[in-house]
Regions:
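C-terminal "cap" of GNAT-fold acetyltransferases
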Residues: 2, 9-10, 26, 45, ...
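The identity of the second residue at the extreme N-terminus of proteins
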Residues: 2-3, 18
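Intrinsic-disorder-associated, low-complexity terminal segments enriched in Asp/Asn/His/Tyr and depleted
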Residues: 7-10, 20
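Acetyl-CoA-dependent GNAT
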Residues: 17, 21-22, 26, 30-106, ...
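Conserved glycine-rich acetyl-CoA-binding loop
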Residues: 86, 108-125, 132-134, 138-139, ...
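Short, intrinsically disordered low-complexity segments
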Residues: 3-4, 8, 28, 83, ...
Length: 179
C-alpha cells in the first residue's frame, strides 16, 4: 500500500512514489489536443518553481495552440505521461519558417519528481531525431541560468553557449550543429 502526499506542484495533487508502479511508469508520446491544459500546467508550474513568470502575450503564446505553432509547420511536441495518464513533462521543436536549416528546442520542462530519471535526455533525443528527419542542421534553445540541471544536459549533448538575443525570462542561448 502506498501513501499519497499532496503536492501543489504536481497536477492532480499527488506526488508519484517509486513504490507505486503506475505512478513511476511513464512513456513519451506526441502531443494531443486534449493535453493542452496539462501542458500549460507543467510549463507554468516549472516556471514558477524557478521564480519565472509566464508571458502569455509573447514567449508563451505558442501554448495557446500547440498544433498551429508546432505540428502544422512540421515541428514536433512531445509529452511525458505517467502510468496514471498525467502529463509530467513537455518538449517542443519549432521549425524556423525563415531559415530551413534552423529550429528551436522549446518548452522542455519536467515536474520536479520526474527529474533525474533520464527523461530529459529522452525528450531531447526525440526532438533532435525529429530535427534531423526534417533536414534541419542547427538547433538553438534559450534558457535561464537558474536551470542548471537542464544546462548540464544540453552541454553534455554538445550544445554550446552562443551570443544573441533571448526572451525576457531567459539569459542564456545555446546551439547545436547537427551532423
Amino acid at each position: 500500500m502506498s501513501i499519497r502526499r499532496p503536492d501543489p506542484r504536481y497536477p492532480g495533487g499527488e506526488t508519484p512514489l517509486d513504490e507505486d508502479p503506475l505512478a513511476s511508469a511513464f512513456w513519451i508520446r506526441g502531443f494531443r489536443r486534449e493535453d493542452a491544459s496539462a501542458v500549460r500546467e507543467v510549463v507554468f508550474g516549472v516556471l514558477a518553481e524557478f521564480g519565472l513568470a509566464p508571458d502569455h502575450a509573447d514567449t508563451d503564446v505558442d501554448l495557446s495552440d500547440v498544433e498551429i505553432h508546432y505540428l502544422v509547420p512540421g515541428g514536433g511536441f512531445w509529452v511525458v505521461e505517467d502510468g496514471r495518464g498525467r502529463i509530467v513533462g513537455t518538449c517542443g521543436l519549432w521549425l524556423d519558417p525563415d531559415d530551413p536549416a534552423r529550429c528551436e528546442l522549446r518548452k522542455m520542462y519536467l515536474l520536479p519528481d520526474w527529474r533525474g530519471r533520464g527523461l530529459g535526455g529522452q525528450l531531447l533525443e526525440a526532438a533532435l531525431a525529429h530535427a534531423r528527419s526534417t533536414g534541419r542542421t542547427r538547433v538553438e534553445l534559450e534558457t535561464n541560468r537558474a536551470m542548471t540541471a537542464a544546462i548540464g544536459l544540453y552541454e553534455s549533448r554538445g550544445f554550446r553557449e552562443i551570443e544573441g538575443e533571448t526572451c525576457a525570462r531567459c539569459d542564456r542561448l545555446f546551439a547545436l550543429d547537427l551532423k
